[in-house]
């Protein structure tokens, strides 16, 4: 039994490779593309010695790239760290330092903010810019799409269900705090929600893939609008993670605010 996010998604991508997994505006990625792009990012992370329990900050808006970067981090048994894009400099420094983040994926619109805090984050091995045409003039800064285009895919491997999944809370009780879960136990809790509508709770990632294949054969794979920010627990857990267990599509909006996205 291997209940691990990366292993589950890899198996789903093998069973329904040509089905869409991510849609953000006009950018559609199939499950095969989702897996392959994440594997190339994972190769880069592995080259930077990101491995079991290494932390990777996701300072991003809702986007395909957010979920690809998260998948890549899981592939190397790292821990994705959700970063609130509304944080100002001091909050960002605290969060990234407190979490021991070693890599940060950041939206290009926050380049200047990253530049201001970079020298106060000595643990960071790489800053990865998502979007924009000009790469931020900063040491150890890389363009997201160039990483994917220049690197091979990291080979798959067996992973531990004891790998950590972490969610940083907001600052309603002071500074942000990281809540840690073992992936196997956390996934089983999510699956009880995902399969509350008549499906048996699966015992392994292979059981999940069988359900996904059945839904695909019956043309019953659906789309889920991720309305909440992925950097919030609600947006990630109910907007993406639960639905991925059924091979569903995560429908994302890059623009902040639903009004801008729909009209």
Regions of interest found by a model, annotated:
Residues 151-168, 174-175, 214-223:
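Conserved pre-ATP/AMP-binding loop-to-beta segment of ANL
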Residues 61-81, 85-89, 97-103, 222-223, ...:
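A short helix-loop-beta submotif of the ANL/AMP-binding
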Residues 30-32, 164-204:
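Conserved AMP-binding A3 loop
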Residues 1-3, 135-163:
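Flexible, low-complexity linker/hinge segments
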Residues 47-48, 75-146:
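Structural core segment of the AMP-binding/adenylate-forming
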Residues 18-63, 70-71, 88-93:
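Conserved AMP-binding/adenylate-forming core of the ANL superfamily
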Residues 189-226, 231-263:
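Conserved AMP-binding/adenylation subdomain of ANL enzymes
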């Amino acid at each position: 039994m291997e209940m691990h996010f990366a292993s589950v998604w890899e198996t789903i991508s093998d069973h329904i490779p040509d089905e869409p997994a991510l849609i953000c505006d006009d950018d559609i990625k199939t499950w095969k593309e989702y897996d392959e792009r994440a594997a190339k990012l994972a190769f880069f992370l592995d080259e930077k010695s990101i491995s079991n329990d290494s932390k990777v900050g996701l300072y991003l808006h809702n986007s395909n790239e957010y979920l690809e970067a998260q998948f890549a981090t899981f592939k190397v048994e790292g821990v994705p760290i959700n970063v609130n894009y509304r944080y100002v400099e001091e909050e960002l420094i605290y969060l990234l330092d407190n979490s021991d983040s070693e890599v940060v994926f950041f939206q290009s619109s926050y380049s200047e903010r990253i530049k201001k805090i970079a020298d106060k984050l000595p643990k960071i091995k790489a800053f990865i810019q998502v979007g924009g045409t000009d790469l931020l003039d900063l040491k150890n800064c890389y363009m997201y799409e160039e990483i994917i285009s220049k690197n091979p895919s990291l080979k798959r491997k067996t992973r531990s269900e004891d790998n950590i999944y972490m969610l940083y809370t907001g600052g309603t009780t002071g500074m942000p705090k990281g809540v840690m879960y073992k992936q196997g136990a956390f996934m089983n809790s999510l699956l009880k929600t995902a399969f509350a509508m008549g499906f048996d709770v699966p015992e392994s990632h292979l059981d999940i893939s069988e359900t996904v294949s059945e839904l695909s054969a019956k043309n019953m794979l659906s789309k889920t609008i991720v309305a909440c920010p992925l950097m919030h627990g609600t947006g990630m857990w109910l907007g993406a993670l639960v639905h991925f267990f059924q091979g569903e599509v995560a429908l994302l909006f890059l623009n902040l605010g639903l009004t801008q996205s729909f009209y």
